[in-house]
């Protein structure tokens, strides 16, 4: 999602990209096998990684010259950071489609995808707690159209129109 907003002229940052900078891919794969089967190990990893991610996000926001910046945080509600932002956008998809996409684009097994989804807040709850909701249940082109429409709404709202 960050890329699509960036293509529309917004300055963006993505929490997942920060994690990818902190933890090498082979280490992420190894850790995933542990943390998605061991809640205590997951909490320990999050306690180490989340403060670094939050610090980088706060630094990014503080250094922006173009407003509003777009910050993508897939686990926003789970980590309790929604108060850092003026508005919250949530992208939701049906669970079966999430699983299908995770398996086809990331190479996860169905079991791995299901464990990742189960470790997160249900999308319905995220949607209720959000200011804007984008339903991503179609093509990339349709998603881009929805993001472009929302980008215009955000610009209008930010300008006070």
Question: Each PLM stretch: what is its role?
Answer:
Residues 11, 33, 87, 131-132:
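Well-ordered beta-strand positions
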Residues 56-62, 69-105:
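ATP-dependent NMP and nucleoside kinases share a basic, alpha-helical "lid"
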Residues 1-34, 145, 152-161:
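Glycine-rich phosphate-binding loop of ATP-dependent small-molecule kinases
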Residues 56-57, 65, 83-84, 104, ...:
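Small-molecule kinase domains that catalyze NTP-dependent phosphoryl transfer to phosphate-bearing small molecules
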Residues 11-67:
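ATP-dependent small-molecule kinase phosphotransfer cores
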Residues 16, 45, 70, 134, ...:
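Residue-level signal for inorganic ion chemistry
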Residues 8, 28, 95-103, 110, ...:
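An amphipathic alpha-helix signature
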Residues 34, 48, 101-102, 116:
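Amphipathic alpha-helical segments that mediate coupling or scaffolding at interfaces
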């Amino acid at each position: 999602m960050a890329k699509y907003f960036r293509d529309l002229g917004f300055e963006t940052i993505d929490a997942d990209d920060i994690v990818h900078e902190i933890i090498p891919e082979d280490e992420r794969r190894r850790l995933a096998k542990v943390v998605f089967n061991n809640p205590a190990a997951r909490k320990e990893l999050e306690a180490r990684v989340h403060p670094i991610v939050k610090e980088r996000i706060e630094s990014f926001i503080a250094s922006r010259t173009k407003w509003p910046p777009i910050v993508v945080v897939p686990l926003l509600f789970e980590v309790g950071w929604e108060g850092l932002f003026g508005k919250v956008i949530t992208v939701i998809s049906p669970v079966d489609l999430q699983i299908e996409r995770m398996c086809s684009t990331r190479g996860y097994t169905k079991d791995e995808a299901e464990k990742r989804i189960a470790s997160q807040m249900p999308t319905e709850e995220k949607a209720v707690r959000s200011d804007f909701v984008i339903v991503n249940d179609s093509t990339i082109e349709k998603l881009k159209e929805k993001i472009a429409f929302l980008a215009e709404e955000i610009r209008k709202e930010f300008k006070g129109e």
